[in-house]
Curated annotation (Swiss-Prot):
A GO cellular component annotation in the UniProt record: cytosol
Family annotation (PROSITE patterns): SM (PS52002)
Residues annotated as signal peptide: none
All copies of domain Sm, residue ranges: 2-74
Record-linked InterPro entries: LSm4/Sm_D1/D3 (IPR027141), LSM_dom_sf (IPR010920), Sm (IPR047575), Sm_D1 (IPR034102), Sm_dom_euk/arc (IPR001163)
Species of origin: Homo sapiens
Single Gene Ontology MF annotation: U1 snRNP binding
Name this polypeptide is given: Small nuclear ribonucleoprotein Sm D1
Length: 119
């Protein structure tokens, strides 16, 4: 399972997120998108070497996140189970009468050649 898919299941969980600039954010996840952008509510944000700031909501760009600190009570074994079965990729079926090759009609021709005899 991809990390982002796991994080998307963490809605309504209270977590601490450490950012790459050293800021720590503690809040309840309202959503995570495929770019790992994380949206939180009831947030306490502590900038490095500063006093904590209370915020109602906060959105964090995914590439600014260093790591998530998850609560110990989180049932990881149930969250990590892959609910969606993996879809096996089907081989493309050959187009009727065309075979598997590309044929002669592809490409840009053979160029001007190397100076052979002219016609």
């Amino acid at each position: 399972m991809k990390l982002v898919r796991f994080l998307m299941k963490l809605s309504h969980e209270t977590v601490t997120i450490e950012l790459k600039n050293g800021t720590q954010v503690h809040g309840t996840i309202t959503g995570v998108d495929v770019s790992m952008n994380t949206h939180l509510k009831a947030v306490k944000m502590t900038l490095k070497n500063r006093e904590p700031v209370q915020l109602e909501t906060l959105s964090i760009r995914g590439n600014n996140i260093r790591y998530f600190i998850l609560p110990d009570s989180l049932p990881l074994d149930t969250l990590l189970v892959d609910v969606e079965p993996k879809v096996k990729s089907k081989k493309r079926e050959a187009v009727a009468g065309r075979g598997r090759g590309r044929g002669r009609g592809r490409g840009r021709g053979r160029g001007r050649g190397r100076g052979g005899p002219r016609r």
